[in-house]
UniProtKB/Swiss-Prot annotation:
Pathway: Carbohydrate degradation; pentose phosphate pathway; D-ribulose 5-phosphate from D-glucose 6-phosphate (oxidative stage): step 3/3. This is 6-phosphogluconate dehydrogenase, decarboxylating. Catalyzes the oxidative decarboxylation of 6-phosphogluconate to ribulose 5-phosphate and CO(2), with concomitant reduction of NADP to NADPH. It is an enzyme of class 1 (oxidoreductase). It comes from the Bacteria. The gene is gnd. SUPFAM superfamilies: 6-phosphogluconate dehydrogenase C-terminal domain-like, NAD(P)-binding Rossmann-fold domains. Belongs to the 6-phosphogluconate dehydrogenase family. One of its GO terms (biological process) is D-gluconate metabolic process. The active site is at 182 (proton acceptor), 189 (proton donor). It catalyses: 6-phospho-D-gluconate + NADP(+) = D-ribulose 5-phosphate + CO2 + NADPH.
Amino acid sequence: MQTNIGLIGLAVMGKNLVLNMIDHGFSVSVYNRTPEKTRDFLKEYPNHRELVGFESLEDFVNSLERPRKIMLMIQAGKPVDQSIHALLPFLEPGDVIIDGGNSYFKDSERRCKELQEKGILFLGVGISGGEEGARHGPSIMPGGNPEAWPLVAPIFQSIAAKVQGRPCCSWVGTGGAGHYVKAVHNGIEYGDIQLICEAYGILRDFLKLSATAVATILKEWNTLELESYLIRIASEVLALKDPEGIPVIDTILDVVGQKGTGKWTAIDALNSGVPLSLIIGAVLARFLSSWKEIREQAARNYPGTPLIFEMPHDPSVFIQDVFHALYASKIISYAQGFMLLGEASKEYNWGLDLGEIALMWRGGCIIQSAFLDVIHKGFAANPENTSLIFQEYFRGALRHAEMGWRRTVVTAIGAGLPIPCLAAAITFYDGYRTASSSMSLAQGLRDYFGAHTYERNDRPRGEFYHTDWVHTKTTERVK
């Protein structure tokens, strides 16, 4: 039997994708670098006739129908290049290699070009949803060689999550576009998680609410505008107690791991000149969390903060303020993420459909939320507008939330609570809507010490001037 698709890499994600494909009627050949994993997987599912395992890479490739479609679910970086190199002797022009791991988008750009020269079609595919999503329907973000997309679309769109009958999978763009969109997804995920943590910290440390009480609040919020996968599971995490009745959250060390995709998003934003302040703040917050011993030492040296504000007489009013702060900050986080996608689309000539990306994230992935429907509708109504902040719905939402948002941020800072992303969000909002900022002084200083010149606000853009700040005190146009 020749199978529909082959998959290399039988870790959790790879195995669950295979089972998902089989559930949807596709036959799958599997291979793993360590043959024991292949044998164990086949023993675990002995009745799946559509599942065939191989210990020889050549036999694995020869088992596939032409054009061959081979999906790599392995560690990003050198292992991907090594696997591609090992496969090439057995492939023919028109065969497809699919990298479904968390690869850096520029690596995917390079691989796409290198393999095209050899006649092999390459796809760099972002997959979100974790173990559960891979098994029952992930969000899939395919990019790479467009000739390969029609060959794999029936498989990917069958196994992807569905929302209102639409698969959370559609063509993203050429080269590294798929992996880039996945990286931005992960950056937004970092921001979402950090914002939820900061809201939890305020409710816990300022209002002195228990984990169980906060879980109840989040469960209610999940029925409102904040409805999302992350709010739902945050409520579940906070609610769970161990056999002794202690909330499990109270036993978890406050040190957060990361795999690097959030950092990639932050670095690319810096390289592209996009003010991704909230997501960068979320990445830095994870770095700071890893300094556990230093934080403990600092806590001993700088104990307590005198409260500037008294506890509210009606906590429910302040809880509503925190809700507004979280929702408004979430809008800013997504606005920044989509701004980055818009800039990358222009820079790399990808032609990204931002509304379609919002739909792809609507189900199956970690940041899935009802919120994304609104984003999709906004981009569908005005595709040229890449800023959520200018969309009518979000303009109204930000104005409605603003006072509670400000009260929350001021109260938290006054109480000495760390809120890097809530603060970054409102600072961005204020900076974004400031027509005449204080940054004129920064450019004046640059001209003073480095003769970097400046534009004048009473002259056309593109004219540059320099002032002799020390000697003649005169100004001249230099270009």
